């Protein structure tokens, strides 16, 4: 009687709307490529969230400030250094952040506001008219960054970007402050730095600018590097993030159906699977523009997290050697969007903001709950052929014993890849029982095809691997 191994890293089913085959992504579970008990890897629940502190509002942005060796976070109408307030921030939308030796800058409400470490607050503006220096049409700030000794910001709705003065950061450079990304006539959507380049992200191109080294008064300090230009654009200001020594971004619909790419040496590499592109395609251009991307690293996982209005998707570079490995995160027992955002390593823990409440949290690896609420974890197997066969002993390896009370695993089967039947409850965790078997002894007769879904609702961490069945 043959025993068949079933992979859990990615299930396969059908879309009932168009009968296409789709991937069923793991939900709240991360794949770990490590040889465990005849399996090439195992799946581990995403770390839970515990409350850390009350703050002024929902999270709007975060940055690690190297000059102060502290995390600066904008929550509601306040700027926080660690857990202490250091300033007021106007507005309620997402903000851009950068920092230098003397100040922490926040791009908010069309202004570049500098919160100096001596307690004063300055807003970037033109030099006094009687100074004799050039007066610029600064317009509205869209995105900010910093390279070497200067802040740089993009002017909303134009292809212009500016740099601050070396001596006084609250004014533009006195001689050569304004530059243009001329391949982006519809405007610079976002700006960033990579190595020693200023990177301007448009809707159809990504341009790089490098220092010229000029010291002559009035000479251009930055010049475009056309050899590094990329013929893709980004969907929104925050649809980009440094990742894997480069940038990852969601492409703009102006260059075709949106996807997720990583930039490398003047060209882009797609990392999205067909199912991820289907999800991105379900959003309008305006909805995609509201997306936020961030990167996170822990326990050898290199994660790219994409926050969309109705989905939170996670790409794991460390598990993607045999093809892109994605999973989904969610909050609650239904399809509510994942609530945590703005992850950053702080002290010896990973802290995060919140999309729903005025709190900050911290990731805990010994739980899978979110603010003491149980979470649902889903895994799927691919459809496989078992023509007129009897199936016994569906077994999953589970690392057990750490639960506070007996947890159950819900198993259900599908024969068409769309509808899953009645769930079978199996105890899968129990306090101090470290070798508990998760076994469904009699599955039944299969007419043609079959696939399985595993569902766990718990506060405890979940570790599953090695799904197998016996076929007669």
What is each residue range found by the language model?
Residues 48-58, 84-93, 122-292:
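Beta-propeller and closely related beta-pinwheel folds
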Residues 113-117, 154-172, 206, 312-320, ...:
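Short beta-strand segments and strand-loop junctions that repeat across beta-rich extracellular domains
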Residues 98-131:
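Hydrophobic or amphipathic alpha-helical targeting/insertion segments
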Residues 65, 116, 155-156, 202, ...:
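Acidic surface patches and DE-rich sequence motifs
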Residues 104-105, 151, 206, 394:
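Generic structural signal marking isolated hydrophobic packing positions
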Residues 107, 201, 389:
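Residues that form or flank phosphate/diphosphate-binding pockets in enzymes
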Residues 1-102, 231-246, 253-472:
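Beta-sheet repeat architectures centered on beta-propellers
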